[in-house]
Amino acid sequence: MLRRLSAIAILSLYSAGALASDAGFRPSFHPDQLKGPPVGRRNEVLVLGTAHLSGLPNTFEPAMLEPLLQRLARWRPDAIATENLSGLQCDFMRRNPSRYAESVETYCFDTDAAHVATGLDVPSANVEMERLLSTWPADPTAAQRRHLAAVFLAAGERGSAQVQWLRLPVQDRITGDGLDAALVEMLDKSLTRRNETNLLAAALAARLGLERLWAVDDHTADSPTPPEDEKAAGEALMKAWDNPQANARRDADKPLYANIGKVDGVLDLYRAYNRPGVGLQAYQADFGAALAEPSPQGFGRNYVGYWETRNLRMVANIREVLGERPGTRLLAIVGASHKGYYEAYLNMMHDVQLVDAEAVLR
């Protein structure tokens, strides 16, 4: 009996030691230290943390983005990635409504009108979009731009359709070539719609002569909270987010938002959101606080798992763009809380060189 107990005790010690060793393990392979390529133009990525423009005070006007647009234009990106879902991802999510119905309603562009106007569903419109872009002329006609805009809308790529609309002279923003009156009205209204995709990404792309945007957001990690847990989960997370770091973050935003209408007020906001330390502040206020949330159901850990998965998939989408187009200079515009995660994950890639946003925004 004693021998058996001793054996159990020894096994327990070995198991505890293994767990302790696992907890302290650090891999010897560090891809961030193995950068390339040795020849050829590097892939460069500038991550621009942004406020969501729809949440700015009424003193904000789109013209106030001009100092920011000028600085980004001087950097001259070849590609611009936005915090939007691709049409193909939304098509997938629509086919799985039991899990994604709420996410589709919140994040996905309704392509029904474009489907009727063009006869193309989302998958076939994406095929046509790629075909058109692969043989796109250096000097397209207005009719070609209108047709591509219609195809982009049918493909669920609303931001890219906006780029084509902006590249058309005002007198050529008319119906025809796949665009009916409803789609033209939609594109016209989007010219002044207060979000960073239209007012920043599409405007910059058109200014630089680019033909499209890259929608890299991902919501496939979304899942509905069981109804019986909704109240408890909400209360647990709200309690976690009521912390000194979150309060300090909100207090720091107040003067930035109050001064939006002043000269360089918008630029000052972007400078603040792209300073070193922003990622750690977001972690301490939000994700780190959620990770420490003590509910037995692990509500905070659920949230952090979703957040990390989403950011990994967003970065994977960016890496795919770079992998297919070596030597690309890419601007990634994303909510400021994502910035630290974007940069940390992108920096792990062999063929990605990060660019300091602070230097670009000076």
Which ranges hold each PLM region?
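N-terminal signal peptide c-region/cleavage motif recognized by signal peptidases
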Residues: S15-G17
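Acidic/histidine-rich helix-loop elements
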Residues: G49-P62
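Low-complexity, serine/threonine/proline-enriched polar segments
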Residues: S103-V170, N247-G288
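A cross-kingdom marker for long, charged
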Residues: N259-R362
